[in-house]
Amino acid sequence: MQKLAEAIAAAVSAGQDKDWGKMGTSIVGIVENGITVLGKIFGF
C-alpha cells in the first residue's frame, strides 16, 4: 500500500513540475501497484 501512495505522490509531483516523462512512469507505477493491492485483497 505504501508503494501505491508513493507512486501517486510521484505522479502529482511530476505533474506540478511538468515532467511528462516522469509522470507517465509514475502512472504505470500506480497501475502496477494498484493491481498488486487488488490481488492481495481478492487473493489472486
UniProtKB/Swiss-Prot annotation:
The keyword Transcription regulation does not apply. Pfam families: PSMbeta (PF05480). GO terms for molecular function: toxin activity. Its main location: secreted. Keywords: Antibiotic, Antimicrobial, Cytolysis, Formylation, Hemolysis, Secreted, Toxin, Virulence. InterPro entries: PSMbeta (IPR008846). Coiled coil: none annotated. It is found in: Secreted. The modification N-formylmethionine is found at M1. Signal peptide: none annotated. One of its GO terms (biological process) is killing of cells of another organism. GO terms for cellular component: extracellular region. The keyword Transmembrane does not apply. Belongs to the staphylococcal hemolytic protein family. Has hemolytic activity and also inhibits the growth of gonococci. This is Antibacterial protein 1.
